[in-house]
Regions:
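Bacterial N-terminal signal peptides
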Residues: 9-19
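Periplasmic alpha-helical coiled-coil/stalk elements that build and connect Gram-negative outer-membrane
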Residues: 139-253, 358-361, 365, 385, ...
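Small/polar, glycine/serine/threonine/aspartate-rich low-complexity segments that form flexible
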Residues: 25-37, 82-112, 119-120, 125, ...
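Short segments within alpha-helical structural elements
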Residues: 203-225, 376-434
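A glycine-/polar-enriched beta->alpha junction
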Residues: 45-55, 62-77, 91, 105-123, ...
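Bacterial Sec-pathway N-terminal export signals of envelope proteins
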Residues: 21-84, 227, 233-269, 319-320, ...
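Transmembrane beta-barrel architecture of outer-membrane proteins
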Residues: 42, 101-103, 148, 193, ...
Length: 460
């Protein structure tokens, strides 16, 4: 039994050594990937031009500017030119005649005081600011989603690479155990355990390969084209950390410049202007009218010599009673203002919560990365010790397989922790109101454009 155990132990060590010599596995089968490499910044630039959410938000922001200009136009002089030609036929006891009359007029009207119109302009001015902030918020949200899908692709490819590497190691061990079993130098239980593990890993490879395709399709949805290039991966030579800023500093920064918060602040201004515009229905309006008219038609449609008339007038309109509709509208607008203020409070609380959550999670992830590296090193030592113990007959094949599985699991945990950290940093920057391009540029420095397919080597 000890001889068999030593032989199998040597086989496990040999299989791991062969797998290590092979290095990183080739690109995932079933996924078309070119020899080119792209990174997060490049995909961000493409998404800015292709993501429908970003394009729609820009269109709404531009529309807001035009609506503001439209409201401004109602405050400026309104000039109209009128022209008319009439055919008139007159009969009486003395005369019967027909003639053509012509009327030309130029009229200018200008509000001297109209509270409703002025406050309506202020409302659309605030709405334009709100649309701009919402466009920036949409871009920030889309950037976080892009980063999340980017690292989901990396995680899926890593998972496939790790499963394939584990499958290779286990398959080589199974091949040699089968050869020894044919010579009655191995136990049937060791053979069956290895066979079951190989079959299970083969099924996992299919699922992992499918997940790679699905995750790349999700990334293509944002970019607007199939993403077939290799993706730049996280570097191992940089220290991942949030920043030297305190949590309180991040919160203050977010409350001051978060675009979602600014959009809701503008929403409160919109509601306030709408309320003041509604109250303007109780105020009088004062307007100036200037007109010039030329006509050959006089009183009672009489034909007269062509006459030029010039009129300047001031009109005053005082609302007295509108059936209570103006007061009801004001009360409704007041409730709208309260709702906008409460929405602002809700968003502000959410900003504080999201910043706190992202900061603490990223800070914990940074510490967890170091712990995961130690865990991986320990798992590698544990696997080596298990193989050595198997050689002395102290453990069985199941124990060795468990140690190998633990080593791959530790590698998965390390990679996942790195991706979670980067995603949380981008999320933190989003809620803190940092420009999306600046956030992506800082994260892109942590990526290595020359990294291999998954940057994963079979365990040592």
């Amino acid at each position: 039994m000890q001889v068999t155990a030593r032989v199998l132990g040597g086989l496990f060590g040999l299989a791991a050594g062969v797998a290590l010599a092979q290095g990183a596995v080739p690109a995932a089968q079933g996924v078309s990937a070119s020899t080119f490499t792209t990174d997060l910044m490049q995909l961000y630039r493409e998404a800015r031009l292709q993501d429908p959410r970003i394009l729609a938000s820009r269109a709404r922001a531009q529309a807001g500017q035009e609506y503001q200009r439209e409201a401004m136009g109602t405050l400026l002089p309104q000039v109209s030119l009128n022209a008319g030609v009439n055919r008139i036929h007159q009969e009486n006891e003395l005369v019967q005649q027909s003639f053509d009359s012509e009327v030309y007029s130029l009229v200018l009207r200008q509000y001297l005081y109209n509270k409703s119109t002025w406050e309506n302009y202020q409302k659309f001015k605030s709405m334009a600011k709100q649309s701009d902030s919402e466009a920036l918020e949409a871009q920030s949200e889309a950037t976080v989603e892009l980063a999340r899908r980017y690292f989901t692709v990396l995680a899926a490819e890593d998972e496939l690479e790790l499963i394939q590497a584990e499958l290779r190691t286990t398959q080589k061990s199974l091949d040699r155990v089968n050869a020894l079993y044919a010579k009655q130098l191995a136990l049937i239980t060791d053979q069956l355990d290895l066979k079951a593990r190989v079959d299970g890993l083969a099924a996992q490879v299919l699922d992992a390969r499918n997940q790679v395709s699905v995750s790349r399709a999700a990334l293509a949805e944002i970019v607007g084209r199939p993403v077939k290039e290799k993706l730049s991966r996280a570097r191992d030579d940089v220290q991942l950390r949030v920043s030297t800023q305190s949590l309180e500093s991040w919160v203050r920064e977010g409350v001051a410049q978060n675009p979602a918060l600014k959009a809701n602040e503008s929403g409160v201004e919109v509601a306030g202007a709408a309320l003041r515009s509604g109250k303007g229905g109780h105020y009088p309006t004062l307007s100036l009218t200037l007109s010039a008219q030329q006509s050959n038609e006089g009183y009672n449609n009489a034909l007269v010599p062509r006459t030029d008339s010039y009129v300047a007038g001031i009109g005053l309109q005082v609302p007295i009673y509108s059936g209570g509709s103006t007061s009801a509208r004001v009360r409704g607008l007041y409730q709208d203002q309260i709702a906008a203020e409460q929405q602002l409070e809700s968003v502000q609380r959410r900003v504080v919560k999201e910043i706190t959550s992202a900061y603490l999670t990223a800070d914990t992830s940074a510490e967890k990365i170091s712990a995961s590296r130690h865990a991986l090193a320990s798992a590698q030592l544990s696997r080596a010790a298990a193989e050595k113990a198997f050689g002395y007959g102290m453990v069985n094949a199941v124990d060795v397989l468990t140690s190998v599985r633990n080593e791959y699991r530790a590698h998965r945990d390390l990679l996942k922790t790195q991706y979670d950290f980067v995603t949380n940093v981008i999320t933190l920057n989003r809620w803190a109101g940092k420009p999306p391009g600046e956030s992506v540029a800082s994260v892109n420095l942590w990526l290595n454009p020359g990294s291999p397919a998954a940057g994963i080597a079979d365990p040592r």
